[in-house]
């Protein structure tokens, strides 16, 4: 087994388009991207779509869009817009490389390193029942000549192509860049399938062929792929191909130290985006699930990561997906954005609720200065801005008691008249407090008999947000209209 490989770094992220992009997949993509860019290499996007029943164009579109949202730009692979091949080592979809796998399988068959196996499912089950389910399959066809097998194929019988392992009696040892030395005894696996009876290749075979022909120098992937490595090393050896270096990353675990599952919250990048997580925060958070900054920083941009990323700092132990910390981290990224940029991110969430808010950039910036400290995710803006939306203003049943007080009508009348007399469209916090004092002077009302009716006339309920912060963001005409609505209920 040769270990000589090009020093020019080439790595890949190879998702299957059978669902969404999970945060674990996003972390794999990020580490490969950082490693490539840190070492002046290339990051390739390959699509492993040989599972015809489950692979969909919709899933592929979703995975590609999520990678684009995260900002992980690849150098070769499917085009992010057209999904067509871009690069000299394509096709980049395994479903378009079937002829390549067939050629390599034919070579292994001719060299006696693989064979056609005509065992049926029934044959295999019988052997398992007799030998025990943990025994390796022993095919009666492993010593057939290729000519014998080809003659039988002419009769219409179906066969898989199996890799022959019986002569490989030794340990397979490699240095995992995350876990150190890993040793596999060859008898861990029996003769494994390369091509199914319909000609479709299996994962381990495609993976080796593609990684070799696409000149991959390093393979960084999740720990769950570690058992696949033995079969892959055997194929590399049989083909006399150089092996890339491997690194297997620890699993991401939930708070109960179980494998992360969508049952306990969002784990799909698209869902996180819809909830209002920023791409920069997602990358920051997943980067620290198994890797640590040498300076101990918790808030990092991709630029920061690129300056210090070293694969040797990956931890082989499972990383906990702490959702509370994730929200906190998103809040730090959110609050660090310039107001104009943050408004662009917030606006789609407000638009979903059909909010009719001022378009003046100065007003938008002022409102964000007020609300930013209370936002952890972008969706938090919805409830913060709702009181400012005239379409959302309703007087709730909880205001009924306040509206029945004898003093309420005088308070609301004074409030409305002072609003109408105010010389400008908006007022400052100081002007609001003075106006509130003037209502007190005119009506003699104080305490809850002063504050609660005014709050009902502003937000539709007697308890809630501080008016001194909300009122300066509200147009005079809006405040007057709300006061009139409240007065009509007295």
UniProtKB/Swiss-Prot annotation:
The gene is gltX. Gene3D superfamilies: 1.10.10.350, HUPs. Its main location: cytoplasm. ATP binds at residue 262. Monomer. Disulfide bonds: none annotated. Keywords: Aminoacyl-tRNA synthetase, ATP-binding, Cytoplasm, Ligase, Nucleotide-binding, Protein biosynthesis. The lineage of its organism: Bacteria, Pseudomonadati, Bdellovibrionota, Bdellovibrionia, Bdellovibrionales. This is Glutamate--tRNA ligase. It is an enzyme of class 6 (ligase). It comes from Bdellovibrio bacteriovorus (strain ATCC 15356 / DSM 50701 / NCIMB 9529 / HD100).
């Amino acid at each position: 087994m040769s270990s000589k490989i090009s020093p020019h770094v080439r790595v890949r992220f190879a998702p299957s388009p059978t669902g969404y992009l999970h945060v674990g997949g996003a972390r794999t993509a990020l580490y490969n991207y950082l490693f490539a860019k840190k070492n002046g290499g290339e990051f390739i996007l390959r699509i492993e779509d040989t599972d015809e029943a489950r692979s969909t164009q919709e899933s592929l579109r979703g995975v590609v869009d999520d990678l684009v949202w995260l900002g992980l730009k690849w150098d070769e692979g499917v085009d992010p817009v057209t999904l067509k091949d871009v690069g000299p080592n394509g096709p980049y979809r395994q479903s378009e490389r079937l002829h390549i796998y067939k050629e390599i399988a034919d070579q292994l068959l001719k060299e006696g390193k693989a064979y056609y196996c005509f065992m049926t499912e029934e044959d295999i089950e019988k052997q398992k029942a007799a030998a025990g389910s943990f025994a390796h399959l022993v095919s009666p066809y492993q010593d057939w000549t290729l000519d014998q097998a080809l003659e039988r194929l002419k009769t219409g019988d179906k066969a898989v192509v199996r890799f022959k392992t019986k002569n490989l009696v030794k340990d397979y040892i490699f240095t995992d860049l995350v876990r150190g030395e890993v040793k596999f005894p060859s008898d861990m696996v029996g003769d494994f399938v390369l091509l199914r009876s319909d000609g479709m290749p299996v994962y381990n075979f495609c993976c080796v062929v593609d990684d070799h022909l696409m000149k991959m120098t390093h393979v960084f992937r999740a720990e769950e792929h570690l058992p696949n490595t033995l079969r892959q090393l055997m194929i590399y050896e049989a083909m006399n191909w150089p092996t890339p270096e491997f690194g297997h990353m620890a699993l991401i675990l939930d708070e109960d130290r179980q494998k992360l599952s969508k049952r306990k919250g969002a784990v799909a990048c698209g869902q996180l985006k819809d909830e209002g997580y920023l791409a920069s925060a997602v990358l920051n958070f997943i980067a620290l699930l198994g890797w640590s900054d040498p300076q101990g920083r918790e808030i990092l941009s991709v630029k920061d990561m690129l300056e210090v990323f070293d694969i040797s700092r990956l931890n082989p132990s499972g990383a906990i997906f702490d959702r509370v910390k994730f929200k906190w981290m998103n809040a730090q990224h959110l609050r660090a954005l310039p107001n104009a940029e943050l408004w662009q991110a917030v606006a789609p969430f407000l638009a979903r609720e059909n909010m009719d808010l001022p378009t003046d950039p100065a007003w938008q910036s002022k409102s964000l200065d007020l609300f930013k400290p209370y936002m952890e995710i972008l969706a938090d803006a919805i409830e913060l801005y709702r009181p400012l939306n005239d379409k959302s203003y309703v007087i709730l049943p909880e205001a009924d008691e306040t509206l029945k007080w004898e003093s309420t009508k005088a308070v609301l009348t004074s409030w409305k008249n002072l609003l109408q007399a105010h010389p400008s469209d908006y007022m400052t916090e100081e002007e609001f407090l003075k106006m509130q004092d003037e209502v007190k002077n005119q009506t003699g009302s104080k305490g809850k008999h002063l504050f609660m009716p005014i709050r009902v006339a502003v937000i539709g309920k007697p308890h809630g947000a501080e008016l001194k912060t909300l009122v300066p963001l509200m147009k005079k005409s809006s405040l007057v209209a709300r006061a009139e609505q409240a007065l009509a209920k007295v």
